[in-house]
């Protein structure tokens, strides 16, 4: 499991008690305190209501600051997702280019295999004339060329296998990122549904 970022820790702490669920109650309490302060019959009662108003205002300011902070973190998170999406698009484009290159290498390997078969057939024909000096020289040259082509074929096959493995890793990474994005979207929908439900519930 990866290290938890500071933004994730702050976000969890800010959301642990809901998201603005008590704002309406605080505002109602502030209005009631203001009315009582206006109608206070003594200095002590007025001072008490004044302190309550200050406390309620402080809570409202804190709630507003918390909401703004969560909103700012959500914006940064969306920017990060957009960046990841662009990186995925670039990776996919690069993968298509690698696939095209691998196809070219496969065609080259097929040509090498065909040439090798032709050289093998020619070598068998040459073997019927072992006494001719020039024929032996040609056979030796063909053997060297065949060995060289075999090395090329092995190199191409190794590169092709490496590209296949790299492409498999890339596809796995893309799939994991897509799953992460889908899970985040589902979580966001659940949170929005909960917020909507809390807003529609009657206040005690």
From Swiss-Prot:
Q: Could you list the residue ranges forming a coiled coil in this record? A: 146-204
N-acetylglycine sites (modified residues): 2
Q: Name one GO biological process term.
A: mRNA export from nucleus
Keyword set includes rRNA-binding: no
Start and end residues of each stretch annotated as Interaction with NIF3L1: 105-204
**What GO molecular function annotation could you give as one example from this UniProt entry?**
RNA binding
- Phosphothreonine is found on 5
Q: Where in the cell is it found?
A: Cytoplasm; Nucleus; Nucleus speckle
Region described as Disordered = 182-204
Transmembrane segments in this chain: where?
none
Q: Name one GO cellular component term.
A: THO complex part of transcription export complex
Instruction: Note the subunit structure.
Output: Tetramer; as part of a THO-DDX39B complex. Component of the THO subcomplex, which is composed of THOC1, THOC2, THOC3, THOC5, THOC6 and THOC7. Component of the transcription/export (TREX) complex at least composed of ALYREF/THOC4, DDX39B, SARNP/CIP29, CHTOP and the THO subcomplex; in the complex interacts with THOC1, THOC2 and THOC5; forms a coiled-coil dimer with THOC5; together with THOC5 and THOC6, plays a key structural role in the oligomerization of the THO-DDX39B complex. TREX seems to have a dynamic structure involving ATP-dependent remodeling. Interacts with NIF3L1.
Annotated function: Component of the THO subcomplex of the TREX complex which is thought to couple mRNA transcription, processing and nuclear export, and which specifically associates with spliced mRNA and not with unspliced pre-mRNA. Required for efficient export of polyadenylated RNA. Plays a key structural role in the oligomerization of the THO-DDX39B complex.
Of which family is this protein a member? Belongs to the THOC7 family.
Per its record, how is this protein called by name?
THO complex subunit 7
Q: Gene name, please?
A: THOC7
């Amino acid at each position: 499991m990866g290290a938890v970022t500071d933004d994730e820790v702050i976000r969890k702490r800010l959301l642990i008690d809901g998201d603005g669920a008590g704002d309406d109650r605080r505002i109602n309490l502030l209005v009631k305190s203001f009315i009582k302060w206006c109608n206070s019959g003594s200095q002590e009662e007025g001072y008490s209501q004044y302190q309550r108003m200050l406390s309620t205002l402080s809570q409202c300011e804190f709630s507003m600051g918390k909401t703004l902070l969560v909103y700012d973190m959500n914006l940064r998170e969306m920017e990060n997702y957009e960046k990841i999406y662009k990186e995925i698009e670039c990776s996919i484009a690069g993968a298509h280019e690698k696939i095209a290159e691998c196809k070219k290498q496969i065609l080259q390997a097929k040509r090498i295999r065909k040439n090798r078969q032709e050289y093998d057939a020619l070598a068998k024909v040459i073997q019927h004339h072992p006494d001719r000096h020039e024929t032996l020289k040609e056979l030796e040259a063909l053997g060297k060329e065949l060995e060289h082509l075999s090395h090329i074929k092995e190199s191409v096959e190794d590169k092709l296998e490496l590209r296949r493995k790299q492409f498999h890793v890339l596809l796995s990474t893309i799939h994991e990122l897509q799953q992460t994005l889908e899970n985040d979207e589902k979580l966001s929908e659940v949170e929005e549904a909960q917020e909507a439900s809390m807003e529609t519930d009657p206040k005690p």
